[in-house]
Amino acid sequence: MTFYNYTIDKGRLKKLIALAYRRYGSARCSQLADELKELGFRFATKAGVSISVDDLTIPPEKKQMLEAAEKEIRTTEERYARGEITEVERFQKVIDTWNGTSEELKDQVVVNFRKTDPLNSVYMMAFSGARGNMSQVRQLVGMRGLMADPQGEIIDLPIKTNFREGLTVTEYVISSYGARKGLVDTALRTADSGYLTRRLVDVSQDVIVREQDCGTERSLRVTAMTDGDQVKISLADRLFGRLLAKDVVGPDGEIIAKRNDEIDEALANRIAAVTDEVYVRSPLTCEAARSVCQNCYGWSLAHGHKVDLGEAVGIIAAQSIGEPGTQLTMRTFHTGGVFTGEVARQEKAPEDGTVKWGKGLSTRKVRTRHGEDAEQVEIAGDLIWKGEGKKAATQTYSLTPGSLLFVQDGQTVTAGQLMTEISLSKTQRSTERATKDVAGDLAGEVLFDRLVPEEKTDRQGNTTRIAQRGGLVWILSGEVYNLPPGAEPVVKNDEQVEVGSIMAETKLVTNDGGVVRLVSNREIEIITASVLLDQAQVKLESSGGREQYVIYTADKQRFLLKAAPGTKVQNHSIVAELIDDRYRTTTGGMIRYAGVEVAKGGRKQGYEVTKGGTLLWIPEETHEINKDISLLIVEDGQYVEAGTEVVKDIFCQSSGIVEVVQKNDILREIIIKPGDFYQDVDPGSVKIESGQLLQPGQDVFPGVTVSTLSQAEWIESPEGNGLLLRPVEEYKVFDEPAAPSQGSQNEEGGRQIELRSVQRLFYKDGDRVKSVEGAPLLSTQLVLEIYGSGNEGISHLSADIELQDDEEEDCQRLQLVILESLVLRRDQESDPLGGASKTRLLVQDGDQIPPGAVVARTEIQCKEAGTVRGIKEGQESIRRVLLERAADRLVVDLPSAPEVKPGQLLVAGQELVPGVKLEESGKVLEINGKGDNYQLVLRRARPYRVSPGAVLHIEDGDLVQRGDNLVLLVFERAKTGDIVQGLPRIEELLEARKPKEACVLARAPGVCQVEYLEDESVDIKVVEDDGTVSEYPLLPGQNAMVTDGQRIDVGHALTDGYNNPHEILDVFFSYYVDKDGCYQAALRGLQAAQKFLVNEVQTVYQSQGVDISDKHIEVIVRQMTAKVRIDDGGDTTMLPGELVELRQVEQVNEAMGITGSAPARYTPVLLGITKASLNTDSFISAASFQETTRVLTEAAIEGKSDWLRGLKENVIIGRLIPAGTGFSSHEEVLGLIETQDDIQGYMIEPIELPTTKKKASATKVKTKKVEADDDLLDDTRARAYAGTQLSQDDEEFEETYDTDEDDFDMDDDDDFGDDED
C-alpha cells in the first residue's frame, strides 16, 4: 500500500478502510482494522487518555462574542421600541444574530483547540471519529444555542451557557423542550422505519439478477447532484461501480472508456475530469424480463466486482434504503426560515476603501428581513471594492439577481463592514406567507400615525381591516376599566375623578314584577303569579313502602300529588290525580259511549270529557297466549265454566263462550265471553241482529225475557248455532268533575296561573281492552294552566310546586308559583381590569313591585384619581373607559425652549434641545416655562411599526388592555426545505402521494411571459414553439419561478412548490404521445418521473448525511414504474383499466402490428410501493403483504396461477428460493439458462502459501496474477482465483501450481499464532 503522510481523522479513516477492502478483500481488511484497533488501544493505554472536566476548555473569546451579540440585540430592541422595525423584523434579527454568534463560537472552539491544545482529549475524540461530533462538542464548550418550543417555533432567548458552565433554571426548562422532542421522535421513528422497510422488501423481493446482458441500447444520463452552489453528490461518486452505456470521449477525441467498461474509482475520477455528463447502464433502463441483468446493475458494492447471477438485488436495495430510516429525523423543527447559511453569502469589506457599482447593475429599493434599507439586484452586475493608497488592491464581486446591496455607488467603507449578501441559488428562492400576532405591552388608547387602513370583504362577506400603507400604531398610556355588560358610565370625557368616586353603574331590573322574596344574599326571587289550594290539606302517607303526598279536599276527596314539592312543572302538566275506584272494571272488555263527548286529540294524557253521559261496558276475558295450537284444550265456540283449564296451565276466571284467535298454527288469543247461551235457536224465528242492545224487560223469544241491559251475539258452537246474551255494565259520567278548580291570587304583568280539574277517558268509543284483571276507564285530574297577556309566548314558562305550612290548622297547603330569579353581582374590592364594584339592594322582602322596577344597583368605583378619557359619543354600548393618571405623565426639565408643539408624538432617543435626549416615547401635552427653565409634559406612549398588508384588530381611538392583540403582521419568508423531511418525505415519494401544494408544470416548451398585476397576483403565459399561447392560472400564494422571456422545456416548474410525480409523467406522456407514439412517449414520461424520484429520495438522505448508492433507489423506482393502464384493448385480449407491464403490452402490440390488427392503447401509471406490492403477478406474495382476503378472493375468481418467481412465494410454499445457490435449479426449470456442457466443475486445489520465513516467490499464472503471500483467503481472492482457473486447461493448472506438502508449514509463526504471541 502507498504511504500516506496525513493525520488520519474520521474521514480519512473511512477512506483507508474502504481502499483496503476494495483492494485486498474482506479478510485482510478486517485484519487491518483489528491491527488499527490494537494500535489505538496500545497508545491510548500508554498515554492514559481520559476525559475529565478540565479538558472542556472554553474559548476565552466567548465573553466578547456574547457581549457583541447582546449589544447588537440591544440596538435592535431600541429600534423596535422606537417603532423603526416591526415585531417580525426584530425577531428575525435576534434569531439571526444568535445563530451567527453560535456558529462563530463553534469555529472559535476548533481554532482554540488547534492553537492551544492539539492533544486535548475532547478535541481528539471528536475529530478522530471515536465518539461525538462538532455539534455535540459545541454544546459542551461553546454555547447550547437556540431551541424550539413544542410548536416548533424558535424561542428568541438562546441558551448562552454550555454544559461545562452549567445552565440557569430558565435555560434548563427551555432546553428540556427539545430534549423531550428528541426522545419522543426516536420512539415513533423506529416503527415507521420498520414498516417502510417491510413495504420496500415486498415490492422488490422478486428482483433477482437472472442474466448477464440484456443488450439494451437505452441508457441513463448521469450528472453531479447539486443544490445551488453546493455539490451534494459528485459525478465520480455517482459513476462508481456502474457500467458505461456509451463510449466516453475526451476533449481531444481520445476514447477514455468504452461501452460496458466497469467504472472503478480511478476511471470515475478520470471521466469526471473531462465531462459533466455520462451515459451509463442502469436498472431503470434494463430490458431483462422480470429482473435486472448483470451489466445494467453493475458492481455489487459488497465486494467491488460485477454482481453474481442469482443475487437478490431487490432485497439488498430495500434493506439499503430502509436501514438508514431510523437515522432520518422524523420532522426537523420548522425553523421559520432562520438558518441563512444556505440562502445568502455575506461579503464584508476586507479593509478600508471605496466601492463602485459595475455597469449594467440595476437595483430596486427593498426593506430587508431585519428592517434595514437595502438595494435588491434585479439585473446582475459587479460590485468593485478598491482599497486606499496608490498600490491598493481591488476586488470584484459578481452579484446574482436577488442579492442585497448595503452600500451606495462610490461610498467609502470600513474594514469588516457588510457590503452585500449574494444570493446563492440559481432560481429565485420560493417564499411562503406567514403571520405573527403583535400584542400590546401596555394598556391605553390607540392612535394611528401615518397608517392608512382599508376594508376588504372576502367572498363569504367577512370584512377585514388591512393596513394599506404601513405606519405606526401608538398606544397612549392610561388605566383602562372593563365595564360589565349593561353598565353605563356616569362620567364625561375630561372629567376629573377621585379615588372611590363612581365611574359607571349597572341596574338590575325585573321584567314581570310581583312580590319580592329574598332567598340568599346573592339571589332575589320575584313571584309574578301564584295559586294556593287553601281549602285542601296535604299529608304525607306511605303505601306499599313508598311515601307519597295526598291532598284532602273539603268534600273529603283524596288526590295523589304527581309532582314532588320543590320541582318545576311545565304548562298543561298533571299536578294531581283523584284516588277513585268507581270507574274501575273487573275484567277486560269493550267500551261504548252513550251521550259522552270528548275533546279532539290528547291520546297521550287521555281524552278530555266535554259533555257527560253514560259509558257502556261489555265485559270479556282475554288471555294473550302466543303459543303452539297443540296446547289448546277447549274448542272454538265451546261453553266453559269458571275455573276450566283452557290452555295448558291457563285457567279461565268466568263462565262463557270461548273464542279462539289463531294465525299460522300459532294460538294468539283466547277470549271468554260471559253471558246466557241459548242453543238450537233458529235465527229466522228471532228478529234480533248480532250486536244489538236489549233493554231490561224486552222479550227475546218466547219464554226468555232480559232482566238487565244486554247485548245479543250469534255464535257458531260445536253443538250447533245459538244466541249469546252478554251482560252490559253502565258507568255514569258527569258534565263537570266534582273536584274544585282554583284561580291565581296575584297577577302582575297580566300573567295568570290556574289549577283546573278535568275528567279524562283512557279509551275511545269502540276500543277493546285486552285484559283479565280489568282497567280504569276514567280519571279526574288537576292540570296546571298558565295564561299570558296578549301575544307573549308562555309555552316556555313553568311553575314551582311548594308546600306552605298553615299555622292555624297545623297542616300544609299546596301552592304553585311562577318565579323570576335575579342574581346579584359579587362585590369586588378590586378587579385587576374592572375597578372596585359595590352592589346596593333597593327592595325589601315582601315588597310588591311593578314590571321594569330597579331591584339593585351595582356601582363601579375608580381605583385612582385622574382624568376620564376614551368615551366615544354616539356609541350604543360603552364597554371600556380610560383613566389618565399622574403615573401616565412624564415631566422633563429643559434648559431652553424645545422645538415641539403640543399633540406631537416623540420617540425615545429624540433630541429635544442640544444635549438632552428623550428617555421614553410619548405625546406632548403642554410646554411651560420661560428663560432657562422649561418643563415639557408628555403622556407616556409606545409606538408599534406596522408593515403594509397587516391585518388590524383595532381602530383609531380604541381602548386596549395590556396583552390585547393589536395587529397580525403578514410577511414573506424563505420556504425552508425542512417542512416535510426525513421519513415522512421518503414515504411521500415512494408511495407516490400527491404533494399538498404542487407546482405548475409547463405542458410544452416555449418562451414565458410573466406579468405582475395590481393585486399582487402573477399572470404566466407560455408562447409555445408552434405559436399557441397557453395560460397557466396560479393558486393564491404561489410565486412564479420563471422570469419574463425565459426559454423553458416541457415539464419545467413555473411556480414554487413540490413537484407532483404523477403530473410529471402525465405532462411528458401527453406531449410526446402524438409525436413518437405510445411506447416512446411512455418511456419518456416514465424516465422523467424516475429521474425525479431518484433525485428527490437522494436529496432527503443527503440532507441527513446518509450515503446510499443510486442503484438501490433505481431498483425500487423501476418496480414503481413498470406498469401501464390499458385505455382501449384494441384487438388484444386486454381489458380497459387493467394494469399490465409496459414490456408485455409492447410485445403484444408488436404481434398485432405484424398481423395488422388494432394495437392496445395505454397510459403509463406510477404506483406507490404499497400499490405495486398488491399488483404483482404473484398473488401469494400480494396476499402475504396486505388485504389478504381481497387478494385471495380475486385470485380465486380470476383463476390466477402463481409462477413462484419471487423469493417470498417460494418461502411460503416451502421450496428452495430462486436466489444464490438455488438460482440455477430454478432457472433450468423455467428454461431460462442454456446448460453449457463445456464447463465442468473444477476441484479447487490448495493454493501454495509461502511462509513468512521463505521469500515469497510470485506464483506465475498466465492470465492473472494471484498473489498468495499470506494465509488469508477470502471471498474476493477465491473469486479471482476461480476466475483465472476456468480459463486455463487442466494441465497448465497442475504444472504451474506446485502442490508440494512442504510449503504448508502452518505451525510456524504465522499471523494466527498461539496466545503467547
Curated annotation (Swiss-Prot):
**Keyword entries, A-Z:** DNA-directed RNA polymerase, Metal-binding, Nucleotidyltransferase, Transcription, Transferase, Zinc
Give the Acidic residues compositional bias ranges.
1288-1317
Region (Disordered): which ranges? 1279-1317
* Key word Metal-binding present: yes
For Zn(2+), which residues are the binding ones?
C214, C286, C293, C296
Q: How is the cofactor bound?
A: Binds 1 Zn(2+) ion per subunit.
Q: Which GO terms describe its biological process?
A: DNA-templated transcription
Q: Which reaction does it catalyse?
A: RNA(n) + a ribonucleoside 5'-triphosphate = RNA(n+1) + diphosphate
GO cellular component term, pick one: DNA-directed RNA polymerase complex
Cofactor(s) required, per the database record: Zn(2+)
As recorded in UniProt, its EC number(s) are 2.7.7.6
Q: Which domain of life is it from?
A: Bacteria
Pfam families for this protein: RNA_pol_Rpb1_3, RNA_pol_Rpb1_4, RNA_pol_Rpb1_5
Q: Which PANTHER family match?
A: DNA-DIRECTED RNA POLYMERASE, DNA-DIRECTED RNA POLYMERASE SUBUNIT BETA
Q: What does this protein do?
A: DNA-dependent RNA polymerase catalyzes the transcription of DNA into RNA using the four ribonucleoside triphosphates as substrates.
Q: What is this protein called?
A: DNA-directed RNA polymerase subunit beta'
User: Species name for this entry?
Assistant: Synechocystis sp. (strain ATCC 27184 / PCC 6803 / Kazusa)
Q: What gene makes this protein?
A: rpoC2
